[in-house]
Amino acid sequence: MPHPELTLERRIDAELCGLDAKMCVYADDLHGHVVERGADDEFESESTIKIYILGCLYAQAEAGKASLDAELTYEARHFVDGSGLIRSLGEGARLRARDVATLMIVVSDNIATNMLIDYLGLDTINAFIRSIGCTHTKLHRSLRSDNWSEKLGTITPRDMGRFFALLAKGELVSPQASDAMRNVFRHQHYNTMLAGSIPPYYTDPEESHVDPDLIYVASKSGSMDACRNDGGLIHTPYGDYVLVMMCTDFANKLEVNDHPSVIYGNRVSRMLFDQYLALEGSFVK
């Protein structure tokens, strides 16, 4: 047994003691060992809520109530400022639902998000969220350029961790759907907080020529003035583990790579990464 002052929880507390902000953490090695720090605290979700829209699309498709190949049209009512590529295609652009969903995750496309909320329905998405046991998470609205001050959604570290634990186990909708969604999350571009401290040798296989399936991150982040959130699964040869970090109450509102949430999030992420590898698939001996 580790010294009581040197448990993972206490080491994370020690690592974060200099952070002038609030950071909550949820980690699960998927072998019965969970690390929690404010895991049930509610946060503004920002773009992390998009994981549930993706999950709902696959669930509805599996139930025959939607189609991944349905043709969705970008209309004026879907427009919103912020991240994404669909706006570059112009109004009237038509894409398959699966491609809209991929853009929603990979480049956090806000217009894609509105197109899918329109296609699936707000109530259907929230019913899916409840159905997988994420009882403290809710999508409140679609995105609009004139209401950034209103919450897009509410989420907790534990609920986000539950989503990715189900995904890792192949239990999110179905094994086939879980694999498809995992592949989408693997290509997500904005993962600095979660993956920034993992050696680039593993995260840039095109340059290192390492097996791209050796170690990878499948995740989704979300950030606005009020929060910086990042969570997902980290795949290793010993299996997957789940890590979610959510940060708020910070002074610096700028989107910068040296933001305190990124610096301290990287430290926590690397600590868990090293622990999991050293113990060959566990957080605890």
Mark where each language-model region is.
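Structured C-terminal helix/loop/strand segments within mature extracytoplasmic catalytic/sensor domains
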Residues: 2-14, 34, 170-192, 196, ...
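Mid-domain, small-residue-enriched loop/turn segments at the edges of structured enzyme/sensor domains
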Residues: 19-23, 115-172
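Short, glycine/proline-biased beta-turn/loop segments that scaffold the active-site neighborhood
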Residues: 63-89
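Short glycine/serine- and small hydrophobic-enriched flexible loop segments
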Residues: 55-63, 106, 118, 162-169, ...
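Active-site SXXK
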Residues: 44-72, 243
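A short glycine/serine-rich beta->alpha loop
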Residues: 37-44, 90, 97, 101, ...
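Beta-lactamase-like hydrolase cores
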Residues: 1-44
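Conserved catalytic neighborhood of penicillin-recognizing serine enzymes
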Residues: 79-114, 153
